[in-house]
């Protein structure tokens, strides 16, 4: 910073840029000189003694370099804007942001209320899933009942009422009271169809055979196997294999009578033959925590076709009461478990 004395005794503080104008001002002066708008005499004048006569000096004072800032004025021409407009713009922006915030809070509240409203639907989904599973099981049991007993279209009381009114039993499968049919047959009622007589005789003979076997003190494994086979549908199923395992272990432990009694008791309670076999593995002590027997076979083709879909990888410690019937071991050492 240097200090120089101007004409008329005024002293002003100037910077290096004041004495050496920038290229912008020099270019502008050159353009004005070449076009003749500024006389040459105005340029080559006594700047020190007559600064007021110099056009360039006036232009330097009235049009300063935008890149420089005078020490007396702190206003930058680039920032020479209306601050009121900036304030108004910021205020409007703040208003918009506030409105968006309010809208977001309202949307969040609506989403929360919607979630609260959907909670009963979530709970209902569990109930529907449970009902679906139970209904599927019930339909499967009903189909099994229809296949094994025929579709009953009326109760025993309704059958008796129809028979008494029309003088003949209703068409199709129906439920009959054993004592009522016995009385009709013994009284030689001519309205009893031949098919009903044959069915009653077969039922009567089966009952007597069951009572005979049930009262037999020592039942053989072969007889017990045949009795269980007679109750099972199909052939070579996993339950047929389970019958063989039950009879084999029962014979080794002298528990055939207990197994037979348990089987008949389950049937008397209304259980299916398959369910009765499973109950034996869970109720008779010799099957609790018992490992399934290992059966050596040459190839997978030796396993009955009805058992193929029930084969599973063998777990570390299979148990009969957990549904593992037996373990098939192939010649190459690979094992397959039969699971029900």
Swiss-Prot record:
What does the PTM comment state? Phosphorylated by host IKBKE. Phosphorylation contributes to efficient viral replication and transcription. Ubiquitinated by host TRIM6 to facilitate virus replication.
A GO CC term assigned to this protein in UniProt:
viral nucleocapsid
| Secretion signal span | none
Q: What is the effect of changing residue 309 to A?
A: Partial loss of IRF3 promoter inhibition. Complete loss of dsRNA-binding
BP GO annotations: negative regulation of gene expression; negative regulation of miRNA-mediated gene silencing; positive regulation of protein sumoylation; symbiont-mediated suppression of host antigen processing and presentation of peptide antigen via MHC class II; symbiont-mediated suppression of host cytoplasmic pattern recognition receptor signaling pathway via inhibition of IKBKE activity; symbiont-mediated suppression of host cytoplasmic pattern recognition receptor signaling pathway via inhibition of IRF7 activity; symbiont-mediated suppression of host cytoplasmic pattern recognition receptor signaling pathway via inhibition of TBK1 activity; symbiont-mediated suppression of host defenses
Q: What is the effect of changing residue 317 to D?
A: No effect on viral replication
VP35 IID domain: residues covered: 215-340
Segments for region (Disordered): 1-24, 33-48
Gene3D superfamilies found in the cross-reference section: Filoviridae VP35, C-terminal inhibitory domain, beta-sheet subdomain (2.10.10.70), Filoviridae VP35, C-terminal inhibitory domain, helical subdomain (1.10.8.950)
Q: Give the subcellular location.
A: Virion; Host cytoplasm
Listed A to Z, the keywords are:
Coiled coil, Host cytoplasm, Host-virus interaction, Inhibition of host IKBKE by virus, Inhibition of host innate immune response by virus, Inhibition of host IRF7 by virus, Inhibition of host RLR pathway by virus, Inhibition of host TBK1 by virus, Inhibition of host TLR pathway by virus, Interferon antiviral system evasion, Isopeptide bond, Phosphoprotein, RNA-binding, Suppressor of RNA silencing, Transcription, Ubl conjugation, Viral immunoevasion, Viral RNA replication, Virion
What outcome is documented for mutating residue 187 to D in this protein?
No effect on viral replication
Coiled coil feature spans: 96-116
- The reply to whether Chaperone figures as a keyword in the UniProt entry is no
The annotated consequence of residue 312 to A reads: Complete loss of IRF3 promoter inhibition; dsRNA-binding and interaction with host PRKRA
Q: What does the record say mutating residue 309 to R does?
A: Partial loss of the ability to efficiently antagonize the type I IFN response
Q: Where is this region: Homooligomerization?
A: 83-145
Spell out which residues are annotated as carrying Phosphothreonine. Answer: 206-207, 210
The UniProt record lists the Glycyl lysine isopeptide (Lys-Gly) (interchain with G-Cter in ubiquitin) crosslink at: 309
**GO MF, any single term:** RNA binding
Residues modified to Phosphoserine: 187, 205, 208, 310, 317
Q: What family does this chain come from, according to its entry?
A: Belongs to the filoviridae polymerase cofactor VP35 family.
What's said on domains?
The interferon inhibitory domain (IID) binds dsRNA.
Q: What is the official name of this protein in its record?
A: Polymerase cofactor VP35
Question: In the record, what lineage is assigned to the organism producing the protein?
Answer: Viruses, Riboviria, Orthornavirae, Negarnaviricota, Haploviricotina
């Amino acid at each position: 910073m240097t200090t120089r004395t101007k004409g008329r005794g005024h002293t002003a503080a100037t910077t290096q840029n004041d004495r050496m104008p920038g290229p912008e001002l020099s270019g502008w002066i050159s353009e004005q000189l070449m076009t003749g708008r500024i006389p040459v005499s105005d340029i080559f004048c006594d700047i020190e003694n007559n600064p007021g006569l110099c056009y360039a000096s006036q232009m330097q004072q009235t049009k300063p370099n935008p890149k420089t800032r005078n020490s007396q004025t702190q206003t930058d021409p680039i920032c020479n804007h209306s601050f009121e407009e900036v304030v108004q713009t910021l205020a409007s922006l703040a208003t918009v942001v506030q409105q968006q915030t309010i809208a977001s809070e309202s949307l969040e509240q609506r989403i929360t209320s919607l979630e609260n409203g959907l909670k009963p639907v979530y709970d209902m989904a569990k109930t529907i899933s449970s009902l679906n599973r139970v209904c599927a099981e019930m339909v499967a049991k009903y189909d099994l009942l229809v296949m094994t007993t025929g579709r009953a279209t009326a109760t025993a009381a309704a059958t008796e009422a129809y028979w008494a009114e029309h003088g003949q039993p209703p068409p199709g499968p129906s439920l009959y009271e054993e004592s009522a049919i016995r009385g009709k047959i013994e009284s030689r009622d001519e309205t009893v169809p031949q098919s009903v007589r044959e069915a009653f005789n077969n039922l009567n003979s089966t009952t007597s055979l069951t009572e005979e076997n049930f009262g037999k003190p020592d039942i053989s494994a072969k007889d017990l196997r045949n009795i269980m086979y007679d109750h099972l549908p199909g052939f070579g199923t996993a339950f047929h294999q389970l019958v063989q395992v039950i009879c084999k272990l029962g014979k080794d432990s002298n528990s055939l009578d207990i197994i037979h009694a348990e089987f008949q008791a389950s049937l008397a309670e209304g259980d299916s033959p398959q369910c009765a076999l499973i109950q034996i593995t869970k109720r008779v002590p010799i099957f609790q925590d018992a490992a399934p027997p290992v059966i050596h076979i040459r190839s997978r083709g030796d396993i009955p076709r009805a058992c193929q879909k029930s084969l599973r990888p063998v777990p570390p410690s299979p148990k009969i009461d957990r549904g593992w019937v037996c373990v098939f071991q192939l010649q190459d050492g690979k094992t397959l478990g039969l699971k029900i």
